[in-house]
Regions:
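Sec/Tat signal peptide C-region and signal peptidase I cleavage site
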Residues: 9-13
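A glycine-rich, hydrophobic loop/mini-helix early in the fold
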Residues: 62-85
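Hydrophobic beta-strand positions in blades of beta-propellers and related beta-sheet-rich domains
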Residues: 72, 170, 223-225
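C-terminal outer-membrane/trafficking sorting elements
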Residues: 76-79, 207-250
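Bacterial N-terminal signal peptides
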Residues: 1-8
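A short, polar beta-strand/turn micro-motif
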Residues: 14-66, 90-210
């Protein structure tokens, strides 16, 4: 009888759900990895655009069950246009999310995303930041952390956006701004002298992103060629030439 009571008590303890919130300074990764304890991670989304990175993978159906009508986007490419560096995102809602990967999330309403560790496909606390460069000398890193980050000069999406319609607006952080766990931000690691702003672009497809970046690179590489006296020459001419202010030997 005493053994049955002990087993029953243990089962109740295992079935009891422990809630943790992504608004705390640091995620309890050790607790979330326990197989004998059901843990529910709660992450608040404002209406509009948010960012998200989780330590486990979820299918599209699991994401749909965790929060209503979310749109998930991933960073697919970057390209400078004029003085603005465009960050191209594509819809990947149908793919769900991968552990440690940063995403852009659109939520039509303010709501909580609630996920239990027992429902996740796998647990992986390795952060997989996305780093991209363009042909103008810009390099961007899109990443997250499992604890709060205070960093001057990091770019992020403000918690509340006083904009209609709601847009994915980026702001450069000051010393008093904090990125809480599971939020993602952009680091402008290398900045071209002519680039002054960052802008998020919601592309219709990966094919569109490829077409934009390829066309821009072709335009740059097919520019006019000059000899050392400043005279325009054929791009197939042999010898030392100048293209876009750089010496080229052919």
């Amino acid at each position: 009888m005493m053994m049955a009571t002990a087993l029953s008590t243990t089962a109740v303890a295992q079935n009891r759900v422990k809630n943790i919130y992504a608004s705390t300074p640091k995620l309890d990764m050790e607790l979330m990895q326990k197989s004998d304890q059901t843990v529910q991670l709660n992450r608040y989304f404002f209406a509009g655009y948010n960012t998200l990175c989780l330590p486990f993978s979820l299918t599209a159906d699991q994401m749909a069950a965790a929060a209503k009508d979310l749109k998930i986007e991933r960073l697919a490419g970057i390209q400078q246009e004029g003085q603005t560096l465009n960050l191209y995102f594509v819809d990947c809602t149908a793919d769900g999310i991968q552990a440690g990967v940063p995403y852009l999330i659109y939520s039509p309403t303010a709501q909580y995303l609630r996920v239990k560790n027992s429902e996740a496909l796998n647990f992986d606390n390795e952060l997989k930041a996305v780093r991209m460069s363009d042909n103008n000398g810009n390099t961007i890193t899109f990443g997250s952390a499992w604890e709060s980050i205070e960093k001057v000069g990091r770019y992020g999406i403000p918690a509340k956006q006083d904009v209609t319609p709601l847009q994915a607006i980026l702001v450069r952080t000051n010393a008093d701004k904090t990125f809480l766990p599971t939020r993602c931000g952009f680091s402008w690691d290398q900045q071209a002298p002519s680039a002054t702003d960052l802008q998020i672009i919601h592309a219709t497809s990966m094919a569109e992103v490829t077409a934009i970046t390829t066309a821009t690179q072709s335009k740059t590489s097919d520019g006019n060629y000059y000899d050392l006296q400043g005279r325009k020459v054929n791009k197939n001419a042999k010898g030392l030439r100048i293209q876009d202010g750089k010496k080229v030997v052919k």
